[in-house]
Structure formats: C-alpha cells, structure tokens
C-alpha cells in the first residue's frame, strides 16, 4: 500500500465527520462475490468491492483547477481527496466536449462524438449510441438495480435542455432501450431540492439501488459557476450521503469525478468505509476504468473492448493490492512562507511560478 505523506488541507472538521462515518460502519475489507454466474437481487447484491455505488459527475476542470495545493480553488474536495483515495492520473476519455465523456462512462465508447454535444439521436454519433448496449443493460442482466438523479430536470427522462439542466449531462436518455422504455424512464428522476430524492432513497436498503448516479445542475457542478460554489455545494451534500443509512450500515462507496479536462488529468476520488484512507495512485486510469471497476465488482460482461481492456480501480479498496505507483502534483510553497516575502509582486511571481511549474511537469509527462 502506498500511503500519501502530504499535508491535509481545507475543511478538517468535515473530514473528521467522514472518517467517523467510516469507523461507525464497522466494515472490513471487501470479500469475493462467491458466484461467477448472474446475480439475483436479494437483501444485498454482493460485490467484490462494494454493494452500493453512488457516482457524482462534476464539470470541466483539470485536477489542479480543483486541488488547492497545485493552484485550485476547492478546499473541501481537496480535503476529501487527501482523506480518502485519489487517482491523480485519471485522463477522462481524452476527448472533448462533455457528451462523449458521459457516453464513455455509461456505454464504453465515445461513439465518435468528439466535438459534439447535441441532443439524443440527433446525428451519426448519437445514433450510434442510441442503438448501443449500455451499463443499464449489464446491471439489469446481472439482477442489479439502478437509478439516476438529475438536478433541475423538469420530469422523468427529460431529453431537452431546461434552465440549469443540460441533457448532454444525462447520458441515460441517449440510449434507445432506456429512453423509449417506460419502466426504465421511471428510474431517471429529478433529484429534488438539495438532492433530497437521492438522500431519501439512501435512507433505506429497500429504496436504494445498487448503482446510483447523480448529476448536479450546471451551477453546482462547476460548469457555469465558480469552483467555490460547487465546492460549497459538495461540502454540504457529501457528508449527508456518507451519514445516510446505506453508507453507515452497508458496503457502500462514493465515486466523484469530473467529465473532462483539458490535456491534464481530472479529479477522481473514491470515498467510503471500504476505501483505503489517505491513499493515492498515479496509475493511468480513464472513464473506461470506472466501467471496468463496476464490471469487476459485480462480474458483469464488458460493453466494448475499451472497458474490457481498461485497468479496473480495485486498488482503492481495502484488502486489494496496490499498483505501487505515485507521482503527486507538486505543492506550491506554504502560504505562511509566501506571506513573509515582502511585496505583492513577489507573491504573484511565486504563486504563478508554482502553477506554471506544475503545468510544465504535466506536459513533459504526456
């Protein structure tokens, strides 16, 4: 196990609460599922790493746009990464803009949608996705349940933009066998005020699905608003998720990532009682690795060669071997030291230099 030796920044009080949640859950490491065949959902749908997974996808930030120690503006998310498990060389799907990355996370392909973020079934690439298999097909064939929550979506399975709801951030309506299936559409729901519907469902194992997806609106996900707004939003939401009945009493995990970056890695963090604490890996992951992890966890067939060949992220869970590779982003000089240097110009030079050094290091490693 590779432990991180860096200083924990930001909201220590919130982190202490989350660590307490992990201890209260009383969990040990993950256990094998015990069966290689299709699973039928009972009281618990046992997985290798977790039995319940909540995925939250944020918007349009490189890793060091988030982490405060390399130029970012999100102290809460920085503290969360320091306390739990971060993949700091996660390269999303190496494509822009948003839509193809959301499709990678749910369909195992960008379907040729580089440069496109239009409506479902609106051009050649979205038609390819429309006719493709997807993660919901795999989950249901494995006897698992799922539900997707969209902040500010007007109604179930809504397939057009509306206010701060962007349909391109709701990948599930891009697949024909979901969007035209009434029972499946009933599982793509508005998240309610402050993600209230999601939190209510996490209040019991009878209402929580095995696979839960949450897309915040275009302000809270940092797409249209400052990073500080999204960070504050997450500082309220994440502790509520971790303090829910499902997270306190079952083998549940939370995965937070960003849909895309701009030539640099994105934030990808695992949180929960079954996740290694103060852990980091610089192994090369992508959005396909998220699918590979879900498939490995529940013994599901891959959707495409992309997720089939992608490394899963099992190393972030207790009892699983580390890939043994760590290359942390460089830390700028401590703030106390910077403040001691006379003249605002010197401060600007030092801070700017630290950020440029980080960026140059990233370029040289690509």
Language-model segment annotations:
Residues 1-45, 324-366:
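Secretory targeting signatures
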Residues 31-325:
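N-terminal pro-sequences and low-complexity stem/linker regions of secreted or lumenal proteins
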């Amino acid at each position: 196990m590779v432990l991180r030796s860096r200083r924990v920044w930001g909201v220590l009080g919130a982190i202490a609460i989350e660590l307490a949640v992990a201890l209260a859950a009383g969990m040990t490491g993950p256990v094998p599922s015990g069966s290689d065949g299709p699973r039928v959902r009972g009281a618990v749908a046992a997985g290798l790493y977790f039995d319940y997974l909540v995925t939250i996808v944020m918007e349009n930030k490189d890793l060091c746009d988030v982490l405060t120690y390399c130029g970012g503006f999100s102290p809460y998310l920085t503290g969360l990464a320091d306390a739990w498990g971060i993949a700091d060389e996660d390269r999303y799907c190496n494509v822009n803009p948003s839509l193809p990355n959301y499709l990678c996370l749910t369909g195992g392909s960008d379907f040729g949608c580089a440069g496109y973020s239009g409506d479902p079934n609106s051009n050649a690439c979205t038609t390819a996705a429309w006719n493709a298999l997807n993660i919901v097909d795999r989950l249901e064939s494995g006897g698992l349940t799922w539900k997707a929550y969209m902040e500010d979506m007007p109604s179930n399975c809504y397939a057009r933009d509306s206010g701060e709801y962007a349909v391109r951030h709701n990948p599930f309506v891009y697949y024909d066998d979901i969007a035209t299936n009434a029972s499946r559409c009933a599982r793509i729901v508005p998240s309610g005020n402050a993600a209230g519907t999601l939190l209510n469902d996490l209040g019991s194992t009878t209402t929580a699905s095995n696979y839960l997806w949450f897309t915040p609106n275009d302000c809270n996900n940092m797409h249209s608003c400052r990073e500080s707004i999204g960070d504050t939003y997450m500082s309220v939401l994440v502790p509520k998720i971790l303090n829910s009945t499902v997270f306190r009493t079952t083998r549940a995990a939370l995965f937070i990532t960003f849909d895309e970056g701009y030539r640099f890695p994105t934030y990808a963090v695992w949180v929960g009682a079954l996740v290694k604490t103060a852990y980091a890996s610089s192994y090369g992951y992508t959005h396909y690795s998220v699918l590979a992890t879900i498939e490995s966890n529940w013994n599901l067939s891959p959707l495409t060669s992309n997720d089939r060949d992608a490394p899963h992220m099992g190393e972030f869970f207790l009892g699983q071997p580390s890939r043994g590779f760590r290359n942390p982003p460089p830390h700028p000089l401590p703030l106390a030291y910077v403040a001691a240097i006379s003249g605002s110009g010197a401060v600007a030079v030092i801070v700017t230099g630290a950020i440029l050094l980080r960026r140059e290091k990233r370029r040289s490693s690509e």
